[in-house]
Amino acid sequence: MPAARPEPQMSTSHVVQRVVLPTEADPEVLALYIDGDSWGTIAGKPVRLSNNNHIEDVLGRQRLRVRAGQDVSFASYFNAFPAAYWQRWTSIPQVTLTIRTSGPGTILVYRSNARGVTQRINSAQVSGKAVSEFALPLTNFIDGGWYWFDLIAGTADLVLEGADYSTTHAPNRTGKASVGITTFNRAEYCVEVVRMLAHEVGIESALDAITVVDQGSQRVSDQPAFPALAKKLGSRLNYITQPNLGGSGGFSRGMLEALNRPESDFVLLLDDDVIVEPEGVMRAVAFGRYTHKPTIVGGHMFDMYDRAQMHSFSEKVDRNRFFWQPKDWSQYRHNFAISNLRQTLWLHERADVDFNGWWMSLIPLEVVREIGLSLPVFIKWDDAEYSLRASDHGFSTVSFPGAAVWHVSWQDKDDYKDWQAYFHARNRAIAALLHSPYKRGGKMINHSLIMSVKHLFKMQYFTDELYSLGIADVLAGPSGLHDMMGTRLGDVRATAVRFPETVVIRDSAALPEPTINVNDVVPYTALGKAGLLAWGLTKGPRHFRKAKAVNIGERPQVSLTASQASWWALAGYDSALVSTADGSGKQHYRRDAKEFRRRLRRTLAQHRALRRNWTRLAAEYRAALADITSRQAWRNTVGLPQTGSSPTVSPKRSSRAASKSVASAKSAASSKG
């Protein structure tokens, strides 16, 4: 048991994680920082037995009051120490936990293993003003485990004055990060992200500059708060305007700017419409400095409107279907207010990932120099493809616990059917051509075809049009990708005017009454896969026959919620009124047999062509990759003068990677089936 000493001593240690509290009075978000409750289990599920998380006990960014006779645990997402990640990805043998307190009480220090088994490893009695230090070895965490501490107040309040985890080991990299924020007409959100970063105490030790790439017509610089931020940041704020080139264009510009800053070792990509935890930014940079070799360090995403709920703890690309997804669907949208760190056993196992979303992603500039910038695809799959490309070059991606942002959830979106459907279809196929290890892409082509046919059964002819355009552009090869960066979005949006179903009826008084009263829809779980197929085979053929005029007139047959509107439900009707995913209105879909037949023939032909030409296309895309992601190509696209600098991908790597890619594509017949 360490002795509590009255005064802190000077240290040359490097702080890698501070214990912090939320800056806003939001009780919901407090569960991500502390756990003051007692828990039990009912039927194997965690149940909170108390409600001791008091937002009014937060006294400052690093100060917390523990009421007399009560206890608080820092076994939380933001304040537990992810020991498993530090052991796996760095060479640090131990960290020191330093806790500064005032008042009487007890400190208990815990660790867990990969199975979530908790062990108390140390404790200290404190009184008055005290500083307690605990040496915590980073051993026996290879598969998982965390460190944390609890505070128990004595007969009077115990106040945490501050705490941190540090190391005396020198980092492998000492440079800072240049932030790259891409924004398009979210000026109010964007200026708030800059404000949160600018006002965090100590963040200047981690950040070299903040680059805002403004691609919209509603300028960030016109926001009332912008002049004061510009004055505070001075030369550290780099505000740029350019045409709308999507996320990949904006983030590539951020990479280009970071490469020109001698003090930067990293570029930190951030979305413009997030709430950022600045301490997480500092932790990501600290972790990135200590990794064995350059590593992409990603932050997790929480729901902006359900603050304790995480989107996904770890994500992968299913190489056979070539589709992104959580590594484990049972861990999807986990709510820490319902089950915190100590109650959630799977959170203790280290989770390795294939990629991390670019809502928050720290990329070493060594990686950028070697593998290039973003794929020129506007939006969708640029982040996943980049990590897959990095992996091909020996660079890993880590989704790092304790580094996170809050972002609007995908739950209120359905971008697979709106204008973004084009980018989903095209960019997924391009990423698969670049990285699939399977002969003719494995199951990817079949899965893409199935998705297209489902949209036809759902009478989503606009979506199918975009899918078709996307596949056609894939078949055209990689040479036109940069040329389309500034124009394809306009083409896609212009297509919508030809399709009446794209009109959202937002006035409830204007909603037509359905002719059929539907009380329920046949559920997937009741049918099973075999029953679902039978249902589709029964109802599908009607789409080849001309619909009755009465069924496709002003009144739809049925009115369905967004969750009811599955393909097997809509396959049985000639028309339907369907709610949008965000609940803002409804869209009127009508069946057209002639369109269905024409579109079905086209999508079958396109996917046959994709399968037939897969080996050739894979070789073309892989051979072109170094060029289309190079600094020269991107400087030309964003309108910057050429510098005559060396290629982004080193010649040795580029030649080897390109020849290897072409060879692997041409030998696909002998690879996995």
What are these regions (language model features)?
Residues 2-151, 426-673:
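Terminal low-complexity segments of carbohydrate-biosynthetic enzymes
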Residues 186-201:
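Short, well-formed alpha-helical segments that are part of the catalytic scaffolds
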Residues 356-360, 365, 369-388, 394-400, ...:
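Donor nucleotide-sugar recognition loop
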Residues 262-275:
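Short beta-strand-to-loop acidic/aromatic patch adjacent to the donor-nucleotide binding site
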Residues 275-328:
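Conserved donor NDP-sugar-binding/catalytic core segment of glycosyltransferases
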Residues 328-360, 414:
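A recurrent flexible, glycine/aromatic-enriched loop bordering the glycosyltransferase active site
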Residues 176-178, 209, 385:
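Cell-envelope/extracellular polymer assembly enzymes that use nucleotide-activated donors
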Residues 197-240:
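Acidic donor-binding segment of Leloir-type glycosyltransferases
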